[in-house]
Regions:
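Bacterial Sec-dependent N-terminal signal peptides
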Residues: 1-12, 21-30
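Hydrophobic core
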Residues: 13, 17-21
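A composition-driven surface/loop motif
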Residues: 11, 29-302
Length: 302
């Protein structure tokens, strides 16, 4: 009798343990209260540790894991919320109760969505991200963001490469700090598309390339502390790309070089001597504007 009772208790304990381990992961349609973050249609809870798999196999292809605020993409991974995995305007990745969500990729993450790309992650660290907005008909209604910064800021670390294609806005939301490389390709449709629509900071060693109707939205600011900045107006741009008051040079920058033509010569700007030359240039519409903190005449090291 005692042996049977022990077996019964062991079975109950095993079932409870299995239920407890499964609980931290829920699919779309389940209760999402208290979820730490979501990846396509999958909601992850704070204590969850393990592999992330989608309800629809097309949503997540490749290996993704989660461990207490750390979302890791192992090798090449594809995320999608369109086509056979149609989830409406669901973002590819979204931080919820986890305000320090950290994304790490050691391969390439390819994403297609009808909503935002990455929402409110604290840090995007390492790897390559190629994200595309794929609902052209609803573009002006959805106004999707490639990266939506978090309330406490989002950092793109050095060594991270991000390409954002056809989003209404490349980077919006809370403050974003760029230490890596970001390439924003504006959508080729009627209506304003923005490269930057928040407060974004470029740091030394970073790269930011913007192809958009408007480089920086009104009342927003791009602070340049160094790196390589390239802004090119989209083919359907309306010619209104004055960035004076929207592009700020950081206090620690002593000099930089700029040009307003791809084949033109660079002009060196010394902040204490001829900064007014640069302010005059950005006070006019520029279909092309490029800044660098590395002397373009300096020979490249082998």
């Amino acid at each position: 009798m005692k042996r049977r009772w022990k077996k019964f208790l062991a079975g109950v304990l095993s079932a409870a343990l299995a239920l407890n381990l499964a609980a931290p992961l829920a699919l779309a349609g389940s209760s999402t209260i208290g979820a730490a973050c979501s990846v396509t249609s999958v909601f992850l809870y704070p204590e969850y540790v393990g592999r992330v798999d989608g309800e629809n196999v097309s949503c997540i292809q490749g290996e993704v894991s989660y461990d207490h605020g750390l979302l890791t993409f192992h090798g090449d991974v594809t995320l999608t919320t369109v086509g056979v995995a149609d989830l409406g305007t669901v973002p590819l990745v979204k931080a919820l109760s986890e305000k320090n969500l950290r994304l790490v990729a050691n391969g390439k993450v390819t994403g297609r969505t009808k909503g935002n790309g990455i929402e409110e992650a604290k840090e995007i660290a390492g790897g390559e991200y190629d994200l595309t907005y794929a609902d052209l008909g609803a573009y002006l209604d959805t106004k999707p963001n490639g990266i939506l910064g978090g309330d406490t800021g989002t950092t793109i670390t050095a060594g991270t490469e991000i390409t954002l294609k056809d989003f209404h806005t490349g980077i919006g939301g809370g403050d974003v700090r760029i230490n890596g490389t970001v390439n924003i390709t504006g959508a080729m449709f009627e209506g304003a598309t923005y490269g930057i629509a928040n407060f974004t900071t470029m740091n030394p060693g970073s790269e930011l390339e913007i192809h958009a109707d408007r480089y920086i939205r009104k009342d927003c600011l791009l602070t340049y502390n160094g790196g390589h900045l390239l802004m090119i107006v989209a083919e359907n741009g309306d010619g209104n790309n004055i960035v004076q008051g929207r592009l700020s040079i950081g206090n620690d920058v002593s000099r930089f070089w700029y040009r307003t033509d791809e084949n033109g010569a660079y002009t060196e700007i010394n902040m204490k001597e001829n900064y007014e030359n640069f302010t005059a240039a950005i006070g006019q519409n520029q279909d092309y504007l490029e800044l660098t903190d590395v002397d373009p005449d300096q020979p490249e090291s082998e």
